[in-house]
Design a protein with these regions (language model features):
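Non-ligating segments of multi-cofactor redox enzymes
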Residues: 1-260
Length: 260
């Protein structure tokens, strides 16, 4: 059974503790300047957006059938049995197909880096595999972000809507969108007002089904071996670059006494 997050925007107070907890868990810089940013980026995997007196989190939706994983030619993205959609930097060749395929515009790219990587929320896979909550759910002071089994969270969301019909829209965003996601959202207003795509636009069909239809149209005469050999070179070269960049970064941090 997939694990999931239930985010209830009606009890979110906009404290941004989820942002801070995420940054700490993923060794990301989080200071006043980062906290003030209102959009996601390669160094901010989740963001709490504000519209008047309403708040809304944006993060990777961890689709049950992730389009990003289906288009990745080297398997750098995959969904774990527990639910998180995770990223393997050692496999990534920087093609950015995942960015184009994501219905929720979640993967971000380190454009300014000499050794760029794709970045997004990975739902704390090590914690989840160990039976723990995600960092954002654990740190949330109001329970606006709750972690648990997807089926249980769906039932709880339905109960909340039934018991408080004047508080919530009669809708669980993520229940069926693109085949269902492991981030479920309850709200009093339209999530589309915060940048989420309309359900009617993305539909209920899992995105990989469209990927398969496109791949079926790829001509057989494409020189597959040149792609394979080229891919092997890129993967090998990529790993060397990643290792060198990480070593340089660690040396710089040690020299400057900084903590990331």
């Amino acid at each position: 059974m997939s694990k999931a997050l239930l985010y209830d925007s009606t009890i979110c107070i906009g404290c941004k503790q989820c942002e801070a907890g995420c940054a700490q868990q993923n060794n990301l810089r989080y200071d006043d300047s980062v906290a003030a940013e209102s959009v996601q980026s390669e160094h901010k995997y989740t963001v709490v957006m504000t519209r008047g007196d309403k708040f809304m989190r944006r993060l990777c939706m961890h689709c049950e059938h992730p389009a990003c994983a289906s288009v990745c030619p080297v398997g750098a993205l995959h969904k774990t049995k527990e639910g998180p959609v995770v990223y393997d930097v050692w496999k990534c060749i920087g093609c950015r197909y995942c960015m184009a395929a994501c219905a929720f515009s979640q993967p971000k790219y380190e454009w300014a880096s000499l050794n760029p990587r794709v970045r997004k929320c990975i739902m704390c896979p090590d914690r989840v595999a160990a039976g723990k909550q995600t960092a954002c759910a654990e740190i949330c002071p109001t329970g606006a972000t709750k972690f648990g089994d997807r089926d249980d969270l769906i039932k709880e969301a339905q109960d909340r809507i039934r018991q408080n019909p004047s508080t919530y829209l009669n809708r669980i965003y993520g229940l069926n969108e693109v085949g269902g996601t492991c981030v479920l959202i309850l709200s009093s207003g339209k999530v589309e007002d915060f940048g989420y795509p309309a359900s009617a636009k993305i539909g209920d069909t899992p995105m990989p089904e469209y990927t398969g239809r496109v791949m079926e149209r790829v001509p057989d005469f494409i020189p597959v071996w040149s792609l394979v050999l080229g891919g092997i070179y890129w993967i090998s070269h990529r790993r060397e670059e990643v290792a060198a960049a990480e070593a340089q970064e660690r040396a710089s941090d040690k020299k400057n006494g900084s903590v990331r």
